[in-house]
């Protein structure tokens, strides 16, 4: 028998420090990781002029690659449905 590992998509949270909505989204993602397989990458938009211009104060944004999944608030049902396609 092989030891196959399931693919775990990496979800990116575009965030900045001192952003309470960002902190809430990240905490919610950590809770979902208890039952769903995915990795989280947090990107501080203030470290990139391009990202700061793109998002400004319109954060947090949750994305998988170029696909935006949620903006401002985590949508657990929509994210669960999206991630079910990777099982």
Model-assigned labels for residue ranges:
Residues 2-31:
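Local sequence-structure signature of Cys/Sec-based thiol-disulfide redox active-site neighborhoods
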Residues 33-37:
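Short helix-capping segments at alpha-helix termini
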Residues 38-49:
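Thiol-based oxidoreductase modules, predominantly thioredoxin-like and allied folds used
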Residues 47-60:
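Short Fe-S-cluster ligation motifs
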Residues 59-68:
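A short, hydrophobic beta-strand/beta-hairpin element that forms part of a small beta-sheet core
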Residues 71-75:
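N-terminal, polar/charged subdomain of small-to-medium soluble alpha/beta proteins
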Residues 78-87:
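Thiol-/selenol-based redox modules, centered on thioredoxin-like
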């Amino acid at each position: 028998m092989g030891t196959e590992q399931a693919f775990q998509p990496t979800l990116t949270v575009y965030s900045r420090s001192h952003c309470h909505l960002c902190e809430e989204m990240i905490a919610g993602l950590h809770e979902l990781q208890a039952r769903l397989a995915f990795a989280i990458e947090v990107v501080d938009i203030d470290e990139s002029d391009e990202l700061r211009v793109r998002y400004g104060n319109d954060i947090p944004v949750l994305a998988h690659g170029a696909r935006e999944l949620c903006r401002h608030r985590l949508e657990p049902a929509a994210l669960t449905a999206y991630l079910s396609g990777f099982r």
